């Protein structure tokens, strides 16, 4: 008799995705972040569901309802901080996952990569709308500043912003619709993640060498299931350390002040994971130019496969590209730092230089380095 897990219509899908899946024998811990992102998404959906049971999406009661969750609901503080810091862990895993893809040439799986870019945009949109919900000062002003960027779109800009706001400013209508979108988007993300996996399993995983690994495959279970469990335990350890010892480390103190449209905070800034994009936005003095640079800073990922000029897939054997990759990482860290600084003299010029370097590295220097390395292979 054949095993039920190989014949049952539903079990068969699970079996071919997580048990009998042929996986390269040499994938490193950088391949753990896909499963960690899945775990993050599950944590966010579960904690978010319990928060939604007690939250009210009304401008008069939103802030108080979050306070009520933290003070009066059983373990409400834990659920709230797991959700807030879970978002930070989500983005850490996302950035490492994308970085891995860039380093090892995983972007050559075009469908998987492009769905990944769509997923990145969806997660960023979800996180932005979630940040508005507690209705603190930074929630309100962050929503005002970021939605206002759409007014830079010629001709339809102003109408578009007022349509999104549901009025002439960020108000009750905005908060209610942001809550609705924030609730539905994670389920769309989960569906997209399923499609992401579907396309990945059409080709099989990439590996650190970038070479075809068909001749040397091992079953996903038990080798990578146990490896993923270790990754999950480390993720949960870091998350719990954050939540239980310094839950407000990554947050903004301004968000503990209820939203007040009459009082603008001295420094409006988004959560830490958007600071690099915010720095790129601010480094261009023109509004439309800034918005275009902001969108392009993420959308540039979609054209990375077209910029691949190397004869090798991975950067494992390409020292010049490796150097440029780590310069890019350092540049993004500098942009993140600049995004959190006030707009004044040394920070403005540093931000502008870092923004130029970001696009220069991806569009010019890395493709050129790959061509150079191709020529070295001829010697």
Curated annotation (Swiss-Prot):
InterPro entries: Cyt_b/b6_C (IPR005798), Cyt_b/b6_C_sf (IPR036150), Cyt_b/b6_N (IPR005797), Cytb/b6-like_sf (IPR027387), Cytochrome_b (IPR030689), Cytochrome_b_C_euk/bac (IPR048260), Cytochrome_b_N_euk/bac (IPR048259), Di-haem_cyt_TM (IPR016174). Keywords: Electron transport, Heme, Iron, Membrane, Metal-binding, Mitochondrion, Mitochondrion inner membrane, Respiratory chain, Transmembrane, Transmembrane helix, Transport, Ubiquinone. GO terms for cellular component: mitochondrial inner membrane; respiratory chain complex III. The keyword Transmembrane applies. Heme b b566 binds at residues 97, 196. Binds 2 heme b groups non-covalently. It comes from the Eukaryota. Heme b b562 binds at residues 83, 182. The keyword Metal-binding applies. The cytochrome bc1 complex contains 11 subunits: 3 respiratory subunits (MT-CYB, CYC1 and UQCRFS1), 2 core proteins (UQCRC1 and UQCRC2) and 6 low-molecular weight proteins (UQCRH/QCR6, UQCRB/QCR7, UQCRQ/QCR8, UQCR10/QCR9, UQCR11/QCR10 and a cleavage product of UQCRFS1). This cytochrome bc1 complex then forms a dimer. This is Cytochrome b. It comes from Uropsilus gracilis (Gracile shrew mole).
